[in-house]
């Protein structure tokens, strides 16, 4: 795994303040993975650090590389995290809620940066998010998870236009609408703990369409259309 982690697969965490080491300069933290995976002279790697910081939008990159994490704003710290993630040009970049702690304006800038860098470098991005707005903007294909299990998979347009799983429908119904005066949708009940997942379909205690068999039979992913599947006993019936 040591040869894969950071080189073939890299990760951006949701809280840069907790992910960056407060006692090391950001440039040294960028260097860490490159020293391990890239066979280049030290001087070349340090030049690459400055180049990466500039690429992710850090002004005065050569100077800021010598600064510590507490000297960066939340948005700039997240840009540093993106720089660390792309430093070895991985095949897969996992972004775990990369904009959670940011205000809306900075969030849009960081996501636009992530999208443009992924396209420019040819890196696949696995985005973990609970924000359907971000998912609609960033993703091509979506996997919906509930209680640790995949309950639906489809391209992003299908997920929003024709969701097949009741949980996915419930999530989309919770989105605020600009037209009309209908009450905001909610999903009844609470998410089960991973040590107390219900038998059968894990969503059945909260599902408005649940049948008796839903409490007994665990559904597997089944076809709900072209390149579309859902783990629901009612799909295809």
Residue ranges and their predicted role:
Residues 1, 25-44, 54-59, 71, ...:
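ABC-type ATPase nucleotide-binding domains, specifically the catalytic core motifs of the NBD
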Residues 1-10, 28, 36, 157-163, ...:
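ABC ATPase NBD coupling module
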Residues 2, 94-98, 102-182:
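P-loop NTP-binding/switch modules centered on Walker-like glycine-rich loops
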Residues 30, 82, 106, 110:
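Hydrophobic anchor residue at the start of the ABC signature
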Residues 59-65, 153-237:
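Short catalytic/signature loops enriched in Gly
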Residues 67-72, 76:
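Conserved ABC ATPase signature
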Residues 87-91:
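A short, proline-enriched helix->beta-strand linker immediately N-terminal to the Walker B motif
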């Amino acid at each position: 795994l040591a040869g894969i982690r950071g080189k073939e697969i890299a990760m951006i965490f949701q809280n840069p303040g907790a992910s960056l080491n407060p006692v090391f300069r950001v440039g040294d933290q960028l260097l860490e993975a490159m020293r391990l995976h890239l066979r280049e002279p030290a001087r070349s790697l340090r030049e690459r650090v400055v180049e990466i910081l500039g690429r992710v939008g850090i002004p005065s990159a050569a100077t800021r590389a010598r600064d510590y994490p507490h000297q960066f704003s939340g948005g700039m710290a997240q840009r540093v995290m993106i720089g660390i993630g792309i430093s070895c040009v991985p095949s897969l970049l996992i972004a775990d809620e990369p904009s959670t702690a940011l205000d809306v304006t900075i969030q849009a800038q960081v996501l636009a940066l992530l999208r443009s860098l992924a396209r420019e470098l040819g890196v696949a991005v696995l985005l973990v998010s609970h924000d359907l707005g971000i998912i609609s903007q960033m993703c091509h294909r979506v996997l919906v998870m509930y209680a640790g299990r995949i309950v639906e998979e489809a391209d992003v347009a299908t997920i929003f236009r024709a969701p097949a799983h009741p949980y996915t429908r419930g999530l989309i119904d919770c989105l605020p609408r600009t037209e009309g005066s209908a009450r905001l949708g909610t999903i009844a009940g609470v998410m089960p703990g991973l040590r107390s997942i219900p038998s059968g379909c894990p969503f059945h205690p909260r599902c408005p369409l649940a049948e008796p068999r839903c409490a007994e039979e665990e559904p597997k992913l089944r076809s709900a259309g072209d390149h579309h599947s859902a783990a629901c006993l009612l799909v295809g019936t």
